[in-house]
């Protein structure tokens, strides 16, 4: 199961941290071990790490976002144009 790390900017870090939307959107995909990160020098820059059982489904959720994904990102104050996703790779 690959680990995925995404980072992006948010409008309100405390709101983003407290939001249940990550679990609501990613939980049904089987995503587990969700961890959040904040840049201590610029708290509007945040990251989230996941263990993802179906990478194709996960990446597809961002490539062709459904209304619930768009609504969750808007609710959380995510600035989608700043989103970068990294996928764990091992030699």
Language model segments and positions:
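Short S/T/G/P-rich N-terminal loop/turn motif that feeds into the first structured element of a domain
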Residues: 1-91
């Amino acid at each position: 199961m690959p680990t995925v790390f995404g980072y992006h900017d948010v409008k309100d870090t405390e709101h983003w941290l407290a939001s249940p939307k990550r679990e609501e959107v990613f939980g049904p995909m089987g995503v587990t071990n969700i961890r959040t990160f904040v840049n201590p020098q610029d708290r509007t820059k945040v990251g989230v790490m996941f263990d993802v059982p179906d990478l194709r489904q996960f990446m597809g959720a961002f490539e062709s976002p459904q209304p619930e994904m768009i609504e969750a990102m808007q609710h959380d104050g995510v600035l989608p144009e700043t989103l970068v996703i990294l996928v764990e790779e091992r030699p």
